[in-house]
Amino acid sequence: MSLKTFKPYTKSTRGTVLVDRSGLWKGKPFKLLTSVNNASKGRNNQGRITSRNHGGGHKQKYRTVDFYRRKFDSIAEIERIEYDPNRSCHIMLVKFEDEKKFYYLAPQKIKIGDKIQNGSNIEIKVGNCMPLQDIPVGIDIHNVELQPGAGGKIARSAGTSVNITGVDGNYSLVKMASGEVRKINSRCMATIGVLSNPDKKNIKIGKAGRSRWLGIRPHTRGVVKNPVDHPHGGGEGKTAGGRHPVSPTGQSAKGLKTRDNKRTDKFIIRRRKGKKK
């Protein structure tokens, strides 16, 4: 995939940079693997806003992607590579020898007609899915399970991958993109390769309307609100807020550590490093 630029015929095309999807499937998604996508629009079951600035957006159908990859002892052929509005990377429709079809996450360097497999003792090849214990050190992988049989949880976004750096007994040492090194059970499944659409990070939306198509609503700064609406609100004239940046509920917005999961701390070998400013 490459990037697509536009001539500045209008204000909305000036500076716009999008991903070129000309090489993707142009038809409708596979009907048996789609369902209605009833997005919550940032509301909970009581209708109250729990995630601000979400709502609207173009109507979408949810593509049921198989993150488990548990169909073994069969070879699948890639029928097509598709755009998925529900995630940043592309997906691929594969057909197995018994005619069953699945949606999988599409890695880079894969093309229509390629053959892929799931299971143990198979070829180290882009698109193949196997246990961590069968993957050599230094290979890029994605869609990694945290618990055997629980389905892929790590490295599922566009252009992402993680790397096996070593082995410790029944565990593999996996280095995340953040720099964190984590112990994962060697029986967990992972897929070879780096995920597709790495240029996603380089796009420029170009206009407010495209954000609304994506379901992103306008964001209002707290400092311009009233005191009843935000801790930074109020003041005579233009003020700087008068306190350290916080969220509308008063939680620090600058580097407060919110992780509280002592149960899995023992699996983290090295913490991620913060970016130097």
Where are these regions (language model features)?
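Structural recognition of beta-strand segments within beta-rich domains
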Residues: N86, V94-F96
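Beta-strand/loop nucleic-acid-binding surfaces
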Residues: E99-K111
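Short acidic-glycine loop/turn motifs at beta-strand connectors
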Residues: F96-E99, A177-S178
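Basic, glycine/proline-rich low-complexity segments that contact nucleic acids
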Residues: M1-R87, Q108-K277
